[in-house]
Amino acid sequence: MKPLTLKFITVFTLLLFAAPAWAWHDKTHLAAAKAGGLDSWYNAAGPDLAKIKAGNIESYNHWFNNNAEAEVTVRMVMDQIGRYNQRNKELDSEGHLYGAILASLRAYEKDLRTGKYARYHLAYCVHYLADLSQPLHNIAYDDFNQAFHDRNDGIVESVILDQPHLITRHMYRITLGDETFEEDLAREIARIANLSRYLGYRLRAEKRLMTREEACVQLGHSASLIRAVLRRYP
């Protein structure tokens, strides 16, 4: 087989498993942001709107396909930071959700230091933190993921904004140190990512949707980490 043909097949395969995925639906994102304490929670669905014009520059911030089914580590999270708002399909075919969380906070701090309005960066961060708990944003975008993704995104959409207790009853305290904030946050991102992908594998093995209770437990993880982040960025 000619090298050029082999390269084409390799790239095509990577792109196939990197097809755009959506996210929790709008009211679900708003509910997670509100439960986590974001005062401008009404902005939390905005990053999905941004995909319409920004395309893959934004969409790759929303998922990590983890085709190798590897354990998510602090190092993996940190290594993704530099890919934020990038769209290199060949070298970054799996997305970089985990790094986007930290990178959006760095962008917030940068704009704050230069006197710019920085709060929109928090809305991006909170959105990514909610995506972190969507199981199908943490596993390969395979046939199962494609078939079940949208329905999983909307599993609690009709009730969650009006019934915040469905999330808050699953929240717990997460502590992020002042001096070790990024490392602590990366550790928590990895922890929740692993919980999410394990659930994703179970859903795939059983060929089913999340239950509403499973979705609310997942959103509780996200809202708990949102609340911890906002203690530093009130």
Language-model regions: role of each:
Residues A19-Y120, N138-P234:
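N-terminal, motif-rich segments that launch catalysis or mediate targeting to/interaction with membranes
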Residues M1-I9:
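Bacterial N-terminal signal peptides that target proteins for export
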Residues A130, L136-H137:
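Short active-site segment of divalent metal-dependent hydrolases/proteases
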Residues A118-V126, A130:
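Short alpha-helix carrying the canonical HExxH Zn2+-binding catalytic motif
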